[in-house]
Every structure is written in C-alpha cells, then in structure tokens.
Swiss-Prot record:
Its main location: mitochondrion. Its cofactor is heme b. This is Cytochrome b. The gene is MT-CYB. GO terms for molecular function: metal ion binding; ubiquinol-cytochrome-c reductase activity. A ubiquinone binds at H201. It is found in: Mitochondrion inner membrane.
Amino acid sequence: MKILRKNHPLLKIVNHSFIDLPTPSNISSWWNFGSLLGMCLIIQILTGLFLAMHYTSDTTTAFSSVAHICRDVNYGWLIRYLHANGASMFFICLFIHVGRGIYYGSYVLSETWNIGIILFLTTMATAFVGYVLPWGQMSFWGATVITNLLSAIPYIGGTLFEWIWGGFSVDKATLARFFAFHFILPFIIAAFALVHLLFLHETGSNNPSGLNSDSDKIPFHPYYTTKDLLGIFLLLLVLMILVLFFPDILGDPDNFTPANPLNTPAHIKPEWYFLFAYAILRSIPNKLGGVLALVLSILILAAFPLLNTSKQHGLIFRPVTQVIYWIFIANLLVLTWIGGQPVEYPFTTIGQIASITYFAIIIILIPVSNTIENNIIKL
C-alpha cells in the first residue's frame, strides 16, 4: 500500500498533499480553519444539490417551493437549515482564516494570499445570489438594492444592471440566472481552492513563531489529519446545535413574507456576514464612492503583502502591531453592528468613523507600526 500511494499517478498527488506533506510541528488550532472551510464547502455542495432537486426558479413558485421543501420533503427542513446555517459557519471560518493569515503574516506567501482573496470574493458572490433564491421580501429587496449599485459605474452602469436583471426590474429572468450562478459558483470555488492548496504546498505552511521551520517538520498524517478531524467534529457539533435548536436565529424575519415589489421593508439589510461591507457602503453619501469603498473593503486585503515592511514574520513578537490588530478586529465588529442598524443619528456617524478607521489601520497605522518596531530592533 505504501509503494502504491507513492508511485500511483493519482494517489501520489493525494500522498504529497495530505499524507507525507512536511508540516511545521508547532502549527496551532488556528491552522485548522482551512480544512474546516473545505468541510463547509462539501456540506454546502451536497445540501445544495438536494435542495436544487426540489426548488423551482420561478417568481410565482420559488417561495412556495422552499415551503414545500420544509414541509413535504423527507428531512427537507434539515437539508434547508443545514444549507442556510452552513453558509454562516462557512463565513465564520472564512473570517477566522483571513484573520489568522493577517496575524501570523501568511500574506507574505503572495500567490496563496491573492488566490484566497479571489476565493473570498467568489464566496461572497455565491452567498449573495443564494440569498435571493427563497424569494422572500428581504431576498427581493436585497437583490434590487445591491444590483442597482452597478448603475453607479460610469458609462456602462445602466446597461450592466439591466443586463444582470434581464429586464427593467428584478423579476423572473433575474431569479433564473441567479439560480444558475448559485449552482455553478461553488464548483468554481472548489477549483480555486485546489489552486490555493497547490500554491501553499509549493512554499510550505507558515507557523506561529514566524521563524523558518525547515529543520523541524513532521508528516501531515497522522498528526494533523487527527487534529483536523477533531476540528471537523466540533464544527459539525456547533452547526447541528444551530440547526436543531436555533435554525432561524441568523435569518431575517422579513424573509418569511413572499416578495412584494409594492411593499418595501422598513430596513433593507443583507445577511450578517455582509454587514461590515454594507456599513462601509452606507457611510459614504455618494453612490459611486460608496460602491468603490464597498469593493475596496475586500480588495484592500491585497495591500497587505505590498505594505509589509516588517523585518519580522507575523505579530507574535510585535506588541505595537498586536494592539492595532485587535483594534482592527473590534472596529470590524462595530461595522457589523452598524450595518444592521437604521440609517439615522448616531449610527451614521459611528459608521463613518469606523469606516475611516478600517482603511486608516491598514494603509497608515500598520505600516507606521512596522517602521517603529524595525527601529526598536536596532536599539
């Protein structure tokens, strides 16, 4: 068996990626979230496949087909809530994964990092089009508001959002194409995830100390396969508690009402995992400026490798940047809270301050703290 896995053309790839892969001996549980994201993706694809068997992408029957899945299909309620809450678990793992990458300086592996940003954007797009499919009030109005932002793009904006809508409003054509996008995008994510792994295995994993670990590596199996299995078990435990005890806690009550173009909800907001970006969008009074800030709130992650001037890898021995990092995390939580609040004083002012702080920390404070720490080393 050992000879087979080392010589067989297909098994050799698996062997080099998951069995004999040399891995730093000191990587902590923060490195588990990559495998948890893989698990989340598998859960989403499988549950999504079964949901697609019963769902109809037509404005007249979409809402009732979701109700039919929950009421009449065997374990349909379980599949639907696994899919809906699985998306939340996916984003929790994604945010922690990116946060760990920033804290431990994984952005120096620039190819892996940039593919990760593409994965992040693709996952956000998938979640957005998926949120529209149940065709509830918040689904419809969320789709209308967010796609309408494309009209802010100079020259081509008007044509672009009419093309995405498939008409002059969000209607049957929009729902049909969003369903098609939602079906195909997870497979594109899976392909990008393989490329992400390919680039990671070219350079080898980072580790918590930020030091070179070539002299102290162990095989991935059985050490980290066991560790990953424990992480997957804990993820499934949390997901099942969420699904079986609090299935609607992360949803929006407005989505229990069928979509009605003549009745606008009091407060249109996306799912919780988009609220930080939505708060940044709303904090700028100009439409085009808001859209640019929204896009930059994610694309600014690509600036980390470019702005990194530190002589040390990661934040483990950098107390000044550690403080700034945790302020950044707190600021993100404030943005998430503001995104779910109505557009009125004092929430608008807090949102504007938090948005400025978000960009200032990445562009100004972290590079300045890098310079300060580099000078401290020289003392």
